[in-house]
Amino acid sequence: MVSASPRGDSLQRAVSVAYSPGSTFKVAQAIAMLSEGTLSPTTQYSCARGFTQGGIHIGCHAHTSPRAVVGALGTSCNAFFCKSFMDMIGNAKYRTRAEAIDRWHAYMSSFGLGRCLGTDVGPEATGLMPSADYLKRVHGQWTPQTIMWVGMGQGEVTATPMQLCNLAAVIANRGYYYTPHLCRATPDHPIDLAYRSKHVAMGTPQAYQITIQGMRAAVVSGTCASINRAAYAICGKTGTAENEGEDHSLFIGFAPMDKPRIAVAVVVDNGGFGADMAAPMASLIIERYLTGRLREYSKYQVEHWAGQAVTPYVPPTDTAKAVKAPTAKKHKARHK
């Protein structure tokens, strides 16, 4: 994906730009917490259109409460994932908070997040998954509340669209991936071994299955119900990431549910809610790949999107500035 921004750059945004993943990141959180046993499939957290912690309010949208993890993924509950993430970091099974966050970091790294994947499209941005050392450098003394926004994919986490697509592939495969690449093998140029080697991710089979159920719930009756199809079962997760200017619109998913053939990630700069732009675009990609054609209504959607160019936000100055960790006041309700 090459930028057509007013900057006139030629960035390969699929691999060279890292975004806040927003609520798409909740699937990675679910696998880690379920696998570690700090969250059970039946654990419920309440949400009254958000929650307040230490005088800070994190918003959410209206949905039934309390929720267990499948329902929380389906409705993209911010309260559930912030609370459960804080409970993981503060869990007594770990000797220290540093041990807990580093264990969490190991899961994220095994999914291909926070590091270069080694794809043949580049240059790659690493993204960021905070470790204990990173948090100590940035915050000094920190608590689970300091980083609670990480639970819902905001704060100090970033990922490239390729990394998010790879995350979808990890889940579709129930726990493994192959390094993404574009070049196919030819008789004279076989595929490099690096692209044929299986990478096994952390996580229990049950954790993957429950997370997949949550992603399916999001499509059947949750935040991306508009892309549900009778012909094939899509599993997905929307995201809306805060940003200067309009929010970014995100979606990750795969299909079919039981014998997946395609994993997709869509990021629309300044596109607004994930359910409004990224998810419908992803559904068109999935439909064309699985069926070899587009329905008439889908063709209409393509024409509609073609006329809906989104102009990325351009700051008033090009002066380079250090990236600063988001502050508590910035975070509002972002779920779709």
Language-model features: locations:
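Beta-lactam-recognizing serine transpeptidase/beta-lactamase-like catalytic domain environment
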Residues: M1-S23, A28-G274, P316-K336
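Short, intrinsically disordered/low-complexity patches at protein termini
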Residues: H63-S65, L128-M129, E287, Y297-V302
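Short C-terminal domain-edge/linker segments immediately following a structured domain
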Residues: N91, L182, V266, L284, ...
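C-terminal, active-site-flanking charged/polar segments
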Residues: D258-P260, G272-E296
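Short, highly charged C-terminal tails/helix-capping segments
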Residues: Y297-V323
